[in-house]
């Protein structure tokens, strides 16, 4: 279903291999080895401008957050169409003033996902051919011919075959002229390096998120917590997958090159962002106030949970007070539940009113756009009709 994704990746690898092997005369194995790094350079070079826009847009979006909050406060309690329209226009003008594109952060992800899927498809298809390594069925992969795929299968780096992986059956390793120990001694340092640079990348991303996280948003806080867990687990993926799964030496090399490049690119872009777009004092004060409010909410939540657990424990230790403690827990829970429900109901009511007003505004915009299209078509049609002219005789009479 995703076979079309292998074409751009295989095309890039083919061009690098042709340049290195046919153009510069490098050994076939060395050419394939360097082609993996060439693939990283090509993909990252294409994505880099979009990644920069994403970082810049993210920083500027954070910078204007106090101004957006001020606009929201200005229109608090006003849900009529005129107010919503005016508020939307102010948001739009603010984004335009700071040159912010709300969709800038989507492009790198939209590019990287198909590239990554295509990459692993190509490398796995090349390293694990149909029919097995002993009797591979000649076949082309994307833009790579069957002969090029076969030359890749015969490629070696430091005498370790590119298709070999740690969990490969012993007979296949013997067929490739290597052993599990040789493969492990080569790829283990690679997976460790990949894990280390993954940790560095996640640490930089975590630091950026800590600087600009929107503590007033439950969605943002939830994503930040999930990212913290991911930052802990992500460095383990190269080690676990590399040592237990069918991940060939070629993918280990790609992981190292990709993570090293990503770390360097992220560090450089972060430095430029900090130098050219430092966080303003207005944002720092707003962010500190948001964080203090969030921490106070979390402190109250922990105090509530701790008190409830303590009361439950005391019910066991002091049975004669069980009814009293149970009633206390029930009252605490009821008050907290009612407060949360009231807050949610208020937010829901406001959101419902705003959605209704925004729906009407969008319908009006669609109707205006439809009328403009009709007027444009009518104008094009009238311009296309030739006006009738009275015939005149040659004498001019």
From Swiss-Prot:
The keyword Phosphoprotein does not apply. It holds the Pfam family 60KD_IMP. GO terms for biological process: protein insertion into membrane; protein transport. It is found in: Cell membrane. Coiled coil: none annotated. Required for the insertion and/or proper folding and/or complex formation of integral membrane proteins into the membrane. Involved in integration of membrane proteins that insert both dependently and independently of the Sec translocase complex, as well as at least some lipoproteins. Aids folding of multispanning membrane proteins. This is Membrane protein insertase YidC. It comes from Corynebacterium efficiens (strain DSM 44549 / YS-314 / AJ 12310 / JCM 11189 / NBRC 100395).
